[in-house]
């Protein structure tokens, strides 16, 4: 009997550029050593008009069969494709990379694809750098839907507990 867990991770992954994408790639490499990991990646993160840099992409070509690049936060049809992917994989754990409340709608939708007790969110930033109006309200709703919050420092832990003391 295998003790390997089936894990689906959701978040930016190369060829999308940026620190969170690079972190996600490293996380998947480590988790894959002892687990069966599939990645649900974004086709794009933001509309071109909102993207602050030259390009969202690097020259990196991902050759992994475990990466499914279908999500677009502004295309609801991609949300259904992502949900289907999660249900088909039937993972033991779902790990979402969170860094901006812009992604809360798609993430809340995708959380409905897996039963409670298996929903983990890795918070890179609890409060986005822009600190938008209503951000804490939506974060509170989001945190209620997840089973485990993973933070990288005490500051983010404190923010999560201020938003939802039961987290």
Where are the predicted features?
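Conserved alpha-helical elements of sugar-nucleotide-dependent glycosyltransferases
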Residues: 19-30, 106, 134, 138
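A short, active-site helix/loop in glycosyltransferases that binds the activated sugar's phosphate group
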Residues: 146-167
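Active-site proximal beta-strand in glycosyltransferases
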Residues: 93-95, 111-129
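Short N-terminal targeting/anchoring amphipathic segment
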Residues: 67-73, 81-105, 118-120, 148
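A short, glycine/small-residue-rich beta-strand->loop->alpha-helix junction that serves as a flexible
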Residues: 11-25, 47, 99-104
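N-terminal strand-loop element at the rim of the active site
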Residues: 13-17, 29-86, 156, 161
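Nucleotide-sugar donor phosphate/pyrophosphate-binding loop at the beta->alpha transition
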Residues: 115, 126-145
């Amino acid at each position: 009997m295998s003790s390997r867990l089936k894990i689906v991770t959701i978040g930016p992954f190369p060829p999308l550029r940026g620190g969170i994408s690079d972190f996600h790639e490293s996380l998947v490499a480590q988790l894959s050593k002892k687990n069966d990991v599939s990645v649900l990646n974004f086709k794009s993160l933001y509309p071109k008009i909102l993207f602050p840099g030259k390009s969202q992409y690097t020259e990196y070509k991902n050759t992994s069969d475990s990466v499914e690049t279908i999500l677009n936060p502004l295309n609801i049809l991609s949300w259904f494709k992502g949900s289907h992917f999660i249900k088909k994989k039937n993972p033991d754990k779902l790990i979402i990379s969170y860094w901006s409340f812009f992604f809360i709608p798609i993430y809340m939708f995708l959380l409905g694809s897996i039963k409670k007790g298996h929903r983990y969110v890795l918070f890179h930033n609890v409060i986005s750098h822009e600190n938008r109006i209503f951000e804490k309200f939506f974060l509170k709703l989001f945190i209620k839907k997840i089973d485990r919050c993973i933070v990288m420092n005490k500051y983010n832990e404190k923010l999560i507990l201020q938003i939802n003391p039961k987290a």
